[in-house]
Regions:
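Conserved functional hotspots at enzyme active or ligand-binding sites that engage polyanionic ligands
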Residues: 1-113
Length: 113
């Protein structure tokens, strides 16, 4: 991907998640971008969820079926990261159904009473 790449919602990108603490995902790993390109471009940040290959049947996992990456998006581990300093690299795109499922699980988690 060219140096002019700007992440967009639905993209799968490789990011460096280190440093992290506790149960958070760390290391260089794929993530699903949730924020739109216009936000990512203006702020230099992106909102994303990490992807794991260790599928455990956890309620907030969203299985990804595309050829770009195998695993599950962790919809409850939302991050807002500097995508340039975390060395974002484009890997592929998830389906509209998959991004809708991530957003639905996130909405359930953030429901305010």
């Amino acid at each position: 991907m060219s140096a002019s790449y700007i992440p967009d919602a639905g993209d799968i990108v490789w990011l460096n998640f280190t440093p992290q603490t506790g149960h958070e995902q760390a290391g260089r790993r794929p993530a699903v971008v949730l924020s739109p390109k216009v936000y990512n471009s203006k702020t230099g940040l992106l909102v994303c969820v990490p992807i794991t290959s260790q599928i455990k049947g956890y309620p907030f996992e969203v299985l990804l079926s595309g050829a770009e990456v195998s695993g599950a998006a962790l919809a409850d581990q939302v991050k807002n990261l500097d995508w340039r300093s975390r060395q974002a690299r484009y890997k592929g795109k998830i389906s509209i159904a998959e991004i809708q499922e991530i957003k639905a699980k996130l909405a359930a988690l953030l429901t305010f009473v």
